[in-house]
């Protein structure tokens, strides 16, 4: 202890420093005091004004001011404007003005503000007629309230952050700063409530003050008037300059605009501003947009707290905004919130209108906006006292700025969208120019380019670039170059189809390698116009020749290249720049004769005109790769025949190119294709062949002819591939699969991959087999939402409703087989009536099948083609069959509604739409059970896109606490647990809406090919049913006629065969040893007809117009060659052919074997004949409708069998599963997939909101309706009122003293994810916690939280009246208010002696402890000081370990008091120790004498941590105010501060 004491004496010696070295000399000491200074707050404000009011340095900046002549706001360069945009002088004026505007919020009756600025007298006055300042003596401060708030720093009525205020005042500086920077400052106010009139004047920068003049005001109205004369010297001015007066005058207009219902007068003249919109008009008056039109302003008063106006800006983003009448010239969170909302909606419009432009980002949209915002924000925060930038987070605004749809629509029409698009177009062109090519002789880095030797040279205009379709075509072209040479011909292969640049995005164009390579090869330059042949000499090639296949895809490639050039350089098409190279599509050869055809219609015409066409060898060329190198050389040798030049025929060509490739021309394209189909139909009816483009004399082709005669075939083919037939409901790919399956007639399952190969072989499928495999998979799928009748059986994993069929296995692993229903739907008796397609001289699938029911309705269809699209829902096959029966009976069909196999939800009609609803039920315990999803909503997608977001994210509040899955591959079951109190809200909103369990199906896009192969639009399902019925009845008549003829022919054949056998057995007919001609003549003479079946088929094909009835018909032309005469004489070919044909007709008799002459065979033939005749009689007795009924009955019986089999298989699986899961736990798991019996079903309803959405979608079909189911801050879609309290987190069981903020709930829910509500927490001690709604981060450390808990804000004034220590055991410091420590400094800096009641020190004299008055601290020796500190430490130790007895405590206290008296120097009674504020107002000599005691008190802070620690354990210790400690570091946390009743240490 002695060593410690000596060390302490050494350190505390005034003659030595901490190291024991001599202290500095007196001269040095003086220099230190000069360097390290302390200023009062008043001195600091005057010395460093930029901290409080902004810079006072002179500068020049452009700002908005009011022009009296033009009566509008103008931008002007103003002097005395500092770097921070506001001069100090302007700021002190603004503080007074904002105070006047704030009074409107306190007194709604206030309606006048008067502002007078007198430059000559340097006087500014601000008057308002709102509630006056209370003219009453402040009980604590012992002064009048006006005196306190205008003459004492850090005084304010805005310190209670618990109160929601929408005023501008906040920190307690405002008006005092104006007082400090004024030579004279007068306050005059009248309070009607207190019936007093008050007036007081300050001077000399608030260092002097007059006595307040108080008088009775009687019944005078309330008012407050501030008159001040700025201290111009402080602002480096000699007088109020014109520029600063202009700025002050504009601020008057600001207040008139931002203060609703207030008349503002400036220098006696009322300002003509009645509303915020009038103020906005002052800014845009006389300003025009880029088209010379006046700017359009879009204005909306969103609520009582928000007004927003917007127009376009050509000077970057501009904003004029006010928060509680404060001009936030730098904006802030309120401006960002509004701007972001506008930008988000504008971007959605821009995405649709700017698909061909550069990628537009949000900040680029904002750059074109000029935003005006006037708002009232609850307790706003700013980044500085100048209040130019509002920093409060949007969640704490106290209100929301929800812009209406009407406002957003008006914004998109005010010119903002056009302005952004213009900028985007300019930006795109600028980037494209950089990507242009140039003329150069050698190019590097372009793979597969075979460059011409003269490309890019002086002879470049003689060069031709050949663009080929793929590498195989390039090989063909290179082979041909050996004929024409490589100097003037280059070759470049295209990989696939070029980009359609007309509607491609700017990014797509820039990143498309093929387009960029083409530009470099040709040397094209964006934005350059090529108007003459001389301009072509600037390119690397003078011509472009397109060498593509002569099929529909090749035509499309040609069109895309034409479109590429026309879109960027339309002038090039007017010059001889573009050509095409055509090759034969069919070649007919006979010996040395070869005929080439360049289109199929031309070949068909030749076949009709040439009788012996069957004697020619026909070869089809599917692509350029089919031609040999020899043929390539032949093509190039006859260049004139194969080279076709494109010719520009006028504006019509431009129109047709845009028609074919512009997305804007969708309606015109539909009309174009419809006209084409009608023309094909008309020519077919009158027996004309299709039109074709290339003839033997064709040398040039106009662009219009190319589009209308060649490119139209591709577009029509696209529709044929994408849109099904109304009759069989199949697309060509699906029809090819069914055709192959019927032809194969497999009895055993076949692998899907193998079946795909077989389809490609038998049906001439020219595309990849992978797409065929997916077509097979789709035909076999049977999950909910796919097929009502799957035509193929799924044997393996063909996909489920979990992922909408995307989870199917590879085609290599799954098998399929034709469904037993397929041949009942596509009846074999209809096969002979089908008209088949032919390709490559091969008979393939029919044009359409003839099902017994309209399969287009059974399985529905979706497809998008060129100019056309279709969507037809599924219907119940039983309903369809029933309606067909009603039509057969002559009755009106019943109305049918969409129906999906195994779908458990609800389908309800609404106008021309249907609402498909899932199934939901309410379970006990605030749970929702979802047991069915809308059709087309797949289980995995629903979980990820709907349920997952409901759990909450960083930006979205949670709606549910968790969800559990009990789904299978065929059923759906989610059990969703809601947050407490949410069920009633969700029920009110609609469970189906909140959980997105409703979708709509439109009935306005039902398009399909009719029986004439023309696209037809159907308005109602009944129209499809009726058209199918009419056609099918005709075909049933034809089927009956065909079957009757077939049975009669078969009976005649059997009868002839039986008669022939009888005659032969009776030896009545001798044919042996006779020539064939004699044999045939003998048979004809005896009445034997040629083959009756073949003869009937021939007649039937002519009558019914069928192209082919049986495969063996095609063999009639393949006759055997006549044998040469043995004598060598030439044979007459026609005569020999005729003889062979006649002989073949009697093969059914002459070709019978000897076994046919037996009696058994004869009897069998007669029996078969009788059976055919019986069948014929039965058939003749039936009508066509009867045949149809029989087919329908057989189909429905089989349908029941198939579905019963599926149910039995499912039941058997469940039984097996039940046995395997015999345990109790397993049984529970099995029953989890079954809907609960305790659920209350929620009846789906069509809400008004859904109706509005449907109607809006109907009005604007081109615009996709985006309906927000959830508010960004509220995923439930329920927007509670701004003042509504949010429910507390479920984990909190005890009742909270104060509702937590929404962000706290978010945090609790997000921390532990799905299982949050399942956790159990240990109950914590009940502590009074406080939320930090104003905190920007929303978080605080644990230690900070404890300090706030222990020092409640409600105890602010309790200390001053305290007489007992017990009242302060939980802490008496008011750490909840940030301004309290500043208030202390303010009072110290005040030049007016305040009453002692304003003391806020921790001394006992503040508590009115009179037993032993506090003494002024004096010098004490080091021993006394050391002893006092040691005793303080000893007093703390026992409390940490054990509890002392009462007598021991008293003894220690007395010893401590005795030592205190020994060490202190007494103070005379008259000089009672002053409060802390008074002590710091003494002169410099007094401050020097107090130097050592201050160091003593600093050392007493060593026990802070222990004190705080003990307070947590429930001891009687109290943590000092941390904010005070940070300021002064002099308070003590020891118990002696509060528990010594006899005496206490003073500062």
UniProtKB/Swiss-Prot annotation:
Binding site for ATP: 99, 128, 156-158, 169-176, 385-387
Domain Topo IIA-type catalytic: 723-1192
InterPro entries: DNA_Topoisomerase_II (IPR050634), HATPase_C_sf (IPR036890), Ribosomal_Su5_D2-typ_SF (IPR020568), Ribsml_uS5_D2-typ_fold_subgr (IPR014721), Topo_IIA (IPR001241), Topo_IIA-like_dom_sf (IPR013760), Topo_IIA_A/C_ab (IPR013758), Topo_IIA_A_a_sf (IPR013757)
Regions of compositional bias (Polar residues) in chain numbering: 9-19, 1537-1547
Cofactor: Mg(2+); Mn(2+); Ca(2+)
UniProt feature, compositional bias: Acidic residues: 1109-1123, 1373-1383
Region called Disordered, residue ranges: 8-30, 1107-1134, 1209-1249, 1261-1423, 1459-1547
Ranges of biased composition (kind: Low complexity): 1331-1344
Site entry: Important for DNA bending: 864
Catalytic reaction equation(s): ATP-dependent breakage, passage and rejoining of double-stranded DNA
Keywords: ATP-binding, DNA-binding, Isomerase, Magnesium, Metal-binding, Nucleotide-binding, Nucleus, Topoisomerase
Site, as annotated: Interaction with DNA: 497, 500, 669-670, 731, 765, 771, 938
Active site: 813
Compositional bias segments (type: Basic residues): 1216-1228, 1513-1528
Entry protein name: DNA topoisomerase 2
Provenance organism: Bombyx mori
Gene: TOP2
């Amino acid at each position: 202890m002695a060593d410690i004491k000596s060390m302490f004496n050494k350190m505390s010696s005034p003659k030595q420093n901490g190291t024991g070295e001599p202290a500095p000399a007196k001269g040095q000491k003086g220099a230190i005091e000069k360097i390290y200074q302390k200023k009062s707050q008043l001195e600091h404000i005057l010395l460093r004004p930029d901290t409080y009011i902004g810079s006072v340095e002179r500068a020049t900046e452009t700002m908005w001011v009011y022009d009296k002549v033009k009566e509008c706001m103008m931008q002007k360069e103003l002097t005395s404007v500092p770097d921070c945009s506001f001069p100090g002088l302007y700021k002190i004026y603004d503080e007074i003005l904002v105070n006047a505007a704030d009074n409107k919020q306190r007194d709604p009756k206030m309606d006048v503000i008067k502002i007078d600025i007198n430059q000559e007298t340097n006087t500014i006055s601000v008057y308002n007629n709102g509630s006056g300042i209370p003219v009453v003596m402040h009980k604590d401060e012992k002064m009048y309230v006006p005196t306190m708030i205008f003459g004492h720093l850090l005084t304010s009525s805005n310190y209670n952050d618990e109160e929601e205020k929408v005023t501008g005042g906040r920190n307690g500086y405002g008006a005092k700063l104006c007082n400090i920077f004024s030579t004279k400052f007068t306050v005059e106010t009248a309070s009607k409530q207190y019936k007093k009139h008050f007036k007081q004047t300050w001077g000399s920068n608030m260092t002097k003050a007059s006595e307040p003049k108080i008088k009775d005001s009687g019944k005078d109205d309330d008012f407050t008037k501030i008159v001040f004369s700025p201290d111009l010297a402080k602002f480096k001015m000699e007088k109020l300059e014109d520029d600063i007066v202009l700025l002050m005058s504009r601020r008057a207009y600001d207040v008139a605009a931002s203060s609703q219902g207030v008349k503002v007068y400036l220098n006696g003249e009322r300002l003509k501003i009645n509303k915020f919109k009038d103020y906005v008009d002052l800014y845009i008056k006389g300003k025009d947009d880029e088209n010379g039109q006046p700017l359009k302003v879009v204005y909306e008063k969103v609520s009582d707290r928000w007004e927003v106006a917007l127009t376009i800006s050509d000077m970057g983003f501009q904003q004029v905004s006010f928060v509680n009448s404060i001009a936030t010239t730098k904006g802030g969170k309120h401006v960002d919130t509004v701007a972001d909302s506008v930008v988000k909606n504008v971007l959605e419009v821009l995405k649709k209108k700017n698909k061909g432009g550069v990628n537009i980002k949000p900040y680029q949209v904002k750059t074109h906006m000029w935003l005006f915002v006037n708002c009232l924000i609850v307790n706003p925060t700013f980044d500085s006292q100048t209040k130019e930038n509002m920093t409060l987070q949007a969640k704490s605004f106290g209100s929301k700025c929800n812009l209406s749809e009407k406002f957003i629509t008006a914004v998109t029409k005010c010119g903002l969208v056009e302005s952004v698009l213009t900028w985007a177009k300019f930006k795109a062109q600028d980037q494209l120019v950089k990507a242009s090519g140039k003329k150069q002789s050698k190019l590097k880095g372009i793979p597969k380019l075979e460059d011409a030797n003269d490309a890019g040279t002086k002879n470049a205009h003689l060069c031709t670039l050949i663009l080929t379709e793929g590498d195989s075509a390039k090989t063909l072209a290179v082979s041909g170059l050996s004929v024409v040479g490589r100097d003037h011909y280059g070759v470049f292969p295209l990989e696939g189809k070029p980009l359609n640049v007309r509607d491609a995005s700017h990014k797509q164009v820039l990143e498309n390698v093929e387009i960029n390579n083409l530009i470099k090869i040709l040397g094209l330059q964006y934005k350059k116009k090529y108007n003459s042949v001389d301009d072509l000499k600037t390119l690397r090639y003078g011509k472009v020749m397109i060498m593509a296949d002569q099929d529909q895809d090749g035509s499309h490639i040609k069109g895309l290249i034409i479109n590429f050039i026309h879109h960027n350089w339309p002038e090039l098409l007017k010059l001889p720049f573009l050509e095409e190279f055509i090759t034969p599509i069919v070649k007919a050869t006979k010996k040395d004769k070869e005929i080439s055809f360049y289109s199929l219609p031309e070949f068909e015409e030749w076949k009709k005109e040439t009788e012996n066409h069957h004697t020619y060898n026909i070869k089809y060329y599917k692509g350029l790769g089919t031609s040999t190198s020899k043929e390539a050389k032949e093509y190039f040798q006859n260049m004139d025949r194969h080279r076709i030049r494109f010719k520009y025929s006028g504006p019509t060509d431009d129109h047709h190119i845009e028609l074919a490739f512009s997305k804007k021309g969708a309606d015109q394209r539909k009309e174009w294709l419809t006209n084409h189909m009608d023309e094909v139909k008309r020519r077919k009816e009158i027996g004309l062949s299709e039109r074709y483009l290339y003839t033997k004399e064709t040398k040039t082709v106009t662009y219009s002819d190319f589009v209308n005669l060649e490119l139209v075939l591709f577009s029509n083919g696209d529709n044929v591939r994408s849109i099904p037939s109304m009759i069989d409901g199949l697309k060509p790919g699906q029809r090819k699969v069914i055709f192959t399956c019927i032809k194969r007639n497999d009895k055993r399952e076949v692998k899907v991959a193998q079946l795909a190969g077989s389809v490609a072989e038998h049906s001439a499928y020219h595309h990849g087999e992978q797409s065929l495999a997916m077509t097979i998979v789709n035909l076999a799928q049977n999950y909910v939402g796919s097929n009502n009748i799957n035509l193929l059986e799924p044997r393996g994993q063909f996909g489920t409703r979990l992922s909408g069929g995307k989870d199917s296995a590879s085609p290599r692993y799954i098998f399929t087989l034709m469904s037993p229903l397929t041949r009942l739907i596509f009846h074999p008796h209809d096969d002979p009536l089908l008209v088949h397609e032919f390709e490559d001289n091969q008979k393939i699938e029919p044009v359409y099948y003839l099902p017994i029911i309209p399969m287009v309705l059974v399985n529905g269809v979706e497809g998008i083609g060129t100019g056309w699209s279709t969507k037809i829902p599924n219907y119940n096959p039983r309903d369809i069959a029933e309606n067909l029966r009603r039509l057969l009976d002559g009755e009106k069909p019943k109305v049918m509604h969409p129906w999906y196999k195994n779908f458990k939800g609800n389908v309800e009609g609404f106008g021309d739409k249907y609402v498909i609803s899932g199934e939901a039920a309410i379970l006990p315990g605030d749970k929702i059970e979802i047991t069915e999803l809308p059709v087309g909503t797949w289980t995995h997608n629903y979980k990820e896109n709907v349920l997952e977001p409901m759990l909450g994210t960083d930006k979205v509040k949670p709606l549910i606490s968790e969800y559990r899955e009990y789904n299978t591959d065929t059923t759906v079951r989610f059990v969703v647990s809601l947050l407490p109190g949410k069920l009633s809200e969700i029920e009110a909103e609609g469970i189906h809406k909140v959980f997105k369990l409703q979708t709509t199906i439109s009935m306005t896009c039902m398009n399909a090919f009719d029986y004439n192969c023309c696209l037809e639009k159907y308005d109602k399902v009944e129209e499809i049913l009726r058209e199918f019925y009419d056609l099918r009845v005709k075909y049933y008549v034809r089927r009956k006629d065909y079957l009757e003829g077939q049975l009669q022919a078969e009976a005649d054949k059997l009868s002839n065969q039986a008669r022939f056998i009888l005659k032969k057995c009776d030896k009545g007919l001798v044919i042996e040893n006779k020539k064939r001609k004699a044999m045939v003549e003998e048979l004809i003479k005896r009445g034997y007809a040629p083959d009756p079946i073949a003869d009937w088929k021939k007649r039937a094909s002519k009558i019914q117009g069928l192209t082919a009835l049986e495969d063996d018909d095609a063999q009639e032309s393949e006759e055997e060659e006549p044998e040469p005469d043995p004598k060598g004489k030439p044979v007459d070919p026609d005569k020999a052919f005729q003889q062979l044909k006649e002989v073949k007709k009697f093969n059914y008799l002459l070709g019978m074997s000897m076994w046919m002459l037996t009696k058994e065979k004869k009897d069998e033939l007669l029996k078969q004949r009788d059976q055919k005749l019986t069948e014929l009689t039965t058939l003749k007795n039936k009508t066509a409708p009867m045949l149809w009924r029989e087919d329908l009955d057989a189909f429905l019986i089989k349908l029941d069998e198939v579905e019963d089999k599926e149910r039995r298989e499912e039941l058997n699986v469940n039984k097996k599963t039940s046995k395997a899961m015999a345990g109790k736990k397993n049984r529970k798991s099995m029953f989890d997939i079954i809907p609960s019996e305790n659920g209350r079903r929620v009846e789906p309803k069509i809400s008004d909101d859904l109706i509005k959405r449907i109607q809006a979608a109907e009005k604007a079909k081109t615009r996709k309706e985006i309906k927000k189911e959830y508010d960004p801050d509220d995923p439930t879609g329920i927007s509670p009122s701004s003042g509504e309290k949010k429910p507390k987190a479920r984990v909190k069981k005890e009742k909270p003293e104060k509702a937590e903020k929404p962000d706290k709930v978010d945090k609790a829910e997000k921390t532990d994810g799905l299982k949050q509500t399942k956790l159990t927490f240990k109950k914590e001690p009940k502590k009074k916690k406080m939320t930090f709604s104003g905190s920007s981060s929303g978080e605080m450390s644990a230690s900070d939280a404890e300090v706030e808990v222990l020092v409640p804000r409600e105890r602010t004034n309790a200390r001053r009246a305290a007489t007992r220590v017990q009242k302060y055991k939980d802490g008496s410091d008011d750490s909840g208010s940030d301004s309290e420590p500043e208030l202390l400094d303010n009072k110290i800096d005040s030049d007016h002696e305040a009453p002692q009641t304003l003391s806020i020190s921790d001394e006992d004299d503040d508590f009115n402890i009179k037993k032993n008055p506090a003494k002024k601290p004096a010098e004490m020796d080091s021993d006394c000081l050391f002893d006092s500190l040691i005793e303080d430490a000893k007093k703390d130790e026992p409390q940490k370990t054990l509890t002392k007895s009462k007598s021991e405590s008293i003894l220690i206290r007395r010893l401590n008091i005795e030592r205190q008296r020994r060490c202190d120097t007494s103070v005379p009674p008259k000089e009672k120790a002053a409060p802390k504020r008074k002590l710091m107002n003494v002169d410099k000599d007094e401050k020097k004498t107090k130097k050592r005691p201050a160091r003593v008190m600093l050392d007493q802070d060593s026990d802070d941590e222990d004190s705080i620690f003990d307070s947590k354990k429930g001891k009687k210790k109290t943590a000092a105010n941390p904010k005070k400690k940070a300021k002064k570091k002099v308070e003590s946390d020891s118990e002696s501060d509060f528990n010594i009743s006899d005496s206490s240490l003073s500062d």
